[in-house]
UniProtKB/Swiss-Prot annotation:
It is an enzyme of class 2 (transferase). It catalyses: cytidine(1407) in 16S rRNA + S-adenosyl-L-methionine = 5-methylcytidine(1407) in 16S rRNA + S-adenosyl-L-homocysteine + H(+). This is Ribosomal RNA small subunit methyltransferase F. GO terms for molecular function: RNA binding; rRNA (cytosine-C5-)-methyltransferase activity. It comes from Salmonella arizonae (strain ATCC BAA-731 / CDC346-86 / RSK2980). One of its GO terms (biological process) is rRNA base methylation. InterPro entries: Methyltr_RsmF_N, MeTrfase_RsmB-F_NOP2_cat, MeTrfase_RsmB-F_NOP2_dom, Nol1_Nop2_Fmu_2, Nop2p, RCMT, rRNA_ssu_MeTfrase_F, RsmB/NOL1/NOP2-like_CS. Keywords: Cytoplasm, Methyltransferase, RNA-binding, rRNA processing, S-adenosyl-L-methionine, Transferase. One of its GO terms (cellular component) is cytoplasm.
Length: 479
């Protein structure tokens, strides 16, 4: 395999020699860092089972090797990699899998370990969405996730990935994570803090990742991490589980941050060892029970994961002084709720009691019921999924609702050919051989919903969002 030319500061190498257990080879560490990272994917079980995905993609000749800590995760090797980018395959476009680095699947595995079934979860640093979508899949779109992202530009990317993967149980916020301990004290059953870090573990993906590295910056970052972890711990309910993770390798940003929390809240913090998370986990185990994954251990990105439990309540922090503002939505109940539920069902959109109908002017939304108790406590960037816009002739059903809620076996679903599906993704109208009998047509491919479209004569008018339209080579050569 080709080698990367990775930039290693001398001080970094000295730090790694000190941090690395004596059971590991430093030469193997350097060699692993210089190998390109193996590609990996996670099957999105909100849309397809692992068995059905493997059967669907079997004709492609993809070599899929299971990732030991994630039942839905696979390292992938493809003969057609140069001909067709993984992100342009039909299965990726319809949300059947997420391109995700193998070690970044570890934190969510830890969050749900030991048969943990949280109902309200916060992902404190969520973009671009790999872990939020993984959490949603583990929850089966039930309960609720608050997905926070501090970077405004990344919130849009986060929402696009949630939409593609059919996630319906999530609220988005755009805050510095340090506000949540005061704003939402002891409100969450589980919290994932995949903390901003120095990124020492990503050199296999970015050989220049350490160009701006310094020991001083590590200490500055660790100070921010301590504040974020403290905020997350305050937002966690007693008995709840918190996972702290980074994609860096130094102890200051990893073990030291967790030990600081334990020293600060001695009687409230319990470390939960991860030695049984997956077979062979003990190869990366620290004395505290954390996983400190150097890249040569499992041939993946460098990573750190710690799991802890909050065993007692904490005194509340001073209440935040910001104003949330008036909430512009009202709940829909009774006849109005029944009417839109029946109209949605007629076009193949179905949901259960986990989602509640709300309205803002002519917009109809579905909010996860488990998030409603947070309304008025924090300002949301986006809450739930937009179901429809009402107009004189009925409802204009929204793309994100179709992807998340549509029943692909609906009586009036129109299954496209590969060529027609590619035309759909290019934003072009479809002229099917068999004209549907209804005006609102659920368009599917590989029995996955692509959108709801209007039939106009013999034409199916394309409703694929303009910002998602693809050019360039797509997947027809692959199906």
């Amino acid at each position: 395999m080709a080698q990367h030319s990775v930039y290693f500061p001398d001080a970094f190498l000295a730090q790694m020699r000190e941090a690395m257990p004596s059971t590991l080879s430093f030469d193997e560490f350097i060699a692993a860092c210089q190998r390109p990272l193996r590609r990996s994917i996670r099957i999105n079980t909100l849309k397809i089972s692992v068995a059905d995905f493997l059967a669907l993609t079997a004709p492609y000749g993809w070599l899929l090797t299971p990732i030991p800590w994630c039942d839905e995760g696979f390292w992938i090797e493809r003969d057609d990699e140069d001909a067709l980018p993984l992100g342009s395959t039909a299965e990726h476009l319809s949300g059947l899998f997420y391109i995700q680095e193998a070690s970044s699947m570890l934190p969510v595995a830890a969050l749900f370990a030991d048969d943990n079934h949280p109902q309200r979860v916060m992902d404190m640093a969520a973009a671009p969405g790999s872990k939020t979508t993984q959490i949603a899949a583990r929850m089966g779109n039930h309960g609720a996730i608050l997905a926070n992202e501090f970077s405004a530009s990344r919130v849009k990317i986060l929402h696009a990935n949630l939409c593609r993967c059919g996630v319906a149980n999530t609220a988005l916020t755009h805050f510095d994570g340090r506000v949540f301990g005061a704003a939402l004290p002891e409100m969450f059953d589980a919290i994932l803090l995949d903390a901003p870090c120095s990124g020492e573990g990503v050199v296999r993906k970015d050989p220049d990742a350490l160009k701006n590295w310094s020991p001083e910056s590590n200490l500055d970052i660790a100070a921010t991490q301590r504040e974020l972890l403290e905020s997350a711990f305050h937002a966690l309910r007693p008995g709840g589980t918190l996972v702290y993770s980074t994609c860096t390798l130094n102890r200051q940003e990893n073990e030291a941050v967790c030990l600081w929390l334990k020293e600060t809240y001695t009687d409230a913090v319990e470390f939960l060892p991860l030695n049984d998370l997956f077979p062979d986990a003990d190869r990366a185990l620290t004395p505290e029970g954390f996983l400190h994954v150097f890249p040569q251990i499992y041939d993946c990105e460098g990573f750190f994961v710690a799991r802890l439990r909050k065993i007692s309540s904490l005194p509340a922090l001073p209440a935040p002084t910001y104003k949330v503002g008036n909430f512009p939505f009202i709940p829909l109940k009774g006849h109005e709720a029944l009417h839109i539920t029946q109209a949605a069902s007629a076009v193949g959109l179905l949901w259960d009691e986990n989602l509640h109908l709300w309205q803002r002017e002519k917009e109809v939304w579905l909010f996860p019921a488990a998030i409603e108790s947070l309304i008025g406590k924090v300002r949301f960037s986006r809450l739930g999924i937009k179901l429809a816009e009402s107009h004189n002739k009925g409802y204009r059903w929204q793309h994100e609702a179709t992807v998340a809620l549509a029943c692909p076996n609906h009586a009036h679903a129109l299954e496209l050919s590969p060529q027609e599906a590619e035309e759909w993704y290019r934003g072009r109208d479809i002229y099917p051989q068999t004209i549907p009998a209804v005006d609102d047509v659920l368009v599917t491919f590989q029995h996955q919903p692509l959108g709801l479209a209007k039939r106009i004569g013999s034409r199916i008018k394309n409703s694929y969002p303009r910002e998602l339209v693809r050019d360039g080579k797509l997947f027809t050569s692959n199906v």
